[in-house]
Amino acid sequence: MINYELLKNRINKSGIKIYALAEACGLTPQRLYNKLNGKNDFRCSEIIYLSKALNLSPEDRNAIFFAQIVD
């Protein structure tokens, strides 16, 4: 399960514009927005591109993209 709130927070803190992130992932901005809002899943390659663009550590990447479901 993806921690969308944490991902959006990291994007905002990075100062990188959505269109630039989308381009880095080979997506349209609308497609990236859909993924950020849980309408579509991220592909492994997109997770890699976003992790690099946002300078995520392996721990941060795992906390965002591989968050565990907690009751």
State each model region's role.
Residues 4-24:
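Short basic helix-loop element that most often maps to the first helix and adjoining turn
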Residues 12, 23, 37-38, 48, ...:
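Residue-level detection of the helix-turn-helix DNA-binding "recognition helix"
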Residues 27-41:
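Recognition helix of helix-turn-helix/homeodomain-like DNA-binding domains
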